[in-house]
Regions:
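Bacterial Sec-dependent N-terminal signal peptides
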Residues: 1-38, 258
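Subset of outer-membrane beta-barrel
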Residues: 29-283
């Protein structure tokens, strides 16, 4: 009986340690996806609007650690709409990013609601060539189930006692404003302008919001350098390469990826494209 109680206490204490690491130590790493290129606004708000057509809606979902009682779930949805401004080839993209994350025994939840705007200045009348300046900012809410938090203060010397106070003073939820800014350049390449390249630089969390349930830890700013190259192999087939270098002290991450894409049906009337790709990276 005593041995079982000790094991139970150890497990609860281990959960608390993991929770504290999530709240305080791993603050330097933002949420991100292996297929990072499917969440462009998380890379750089100035990458909004870099697509064919007027509207783009993207969704990404990640589910980790399914073997545990409370798996880690992360989802992202971004929507963009672009329209011309002025008399030239300039245009504006407006939209937003919604990011949701849920993790751990204490059901730690994070919700980002981030509207964005991106202005694209045309640099040429002979080809597609734009310099873009984007801004994204909104609110982030973080919360947890306070009743699930357990600490060593609830160990009475023999076993875990949930009726004892946990000795912690933090609240179960808080919100903060988060802001990002970025620039990008994109242009067509080749004798027939059949290829496409872009690169950009973004500065995230430049307002350094407080990012802790204790209200005493500033969110570390993050730099992201991005690049991409689209090569058309023929009228219906193309390859796209993406790369990011992320620096958020003390972490640095380099990710690269690519997709092979093929339009289905008639090359001029097709609205369906099949993609296959991979994403290696290093931290």
């Amino acid at each position: 009986m005593i041995k079982r109680a000790i094991i139970s206490t150890y497990r609860r204490f281990l959960h608390f340690v993991i929770f504290m690491m999530m709240c305080n130590v791993v603050i330097g790493q933002d949420l991100h996806f292996s297929q990072f290129y499917e969440a462009p606004l998380l890379r750089n708000p100035a990458l909004a609007g870099l697509y064919e057509g007027d509207v783009r809606i993207q969704g990404v979902y990640r589910n980790q650690w399914n073997s545990v009682a409370f798996p880690y779930q992360t989802g992202s949805i971004n929507a963009e709409y672009k329209f011309p401004v002025g008399k030239g080839e300039d245009f504006l993209t407006v939209g937003g990013q919604v990011l949701y994350d849920k993790a751990g025994t204490v059901q730690l939840q994070t919700v980002h609601m981030l509207p964005m705007v991106n202005f694209h200045k045309s640099l040429s009348t002979n080809k597609v060539s734009y310099l873009s300046l984007g801004f994204m900012g909104g609110m982030v809410n973080r919360r947890l189930d306070r009743s699930r938090v357990t600490t060593n203060s609830q160990y009475d010397g023999f076993y875990f006692n949930g009726s004892l106070p946990d000795g912690e003073t933090f609240t179960g939820a808080y919100s903060y404003a988060d802001m990002s800014v970025g620039m990008s350049f994109n242009t067509t390449l080749g004798s027939n302008d059949q290829h496409y390249v872009f690169w950009g630089l973004a500065y995230h969390h430049f307002n350094k919001p407080m990012h802790s349930f204790y209200g005493n830890i500033a969110h570390l700013p993050k730099w992201v350098a991005s690049g991409g190259l689209k090569l058309n192999l023929d009228d219906v087939t193309y390859i796209t390469f993406h790369g990011d270098i992320t620096d958020q002290k003390p972490f640095r991450e380099i990710m690269g990826g690519g997709t092979f894409s093929k339009r289905l049906g008639d090359e001029y009337a097709s609205t369906t494209t099949v993609h296959a790709g991979c994403t290696p990276g290093t931290t």
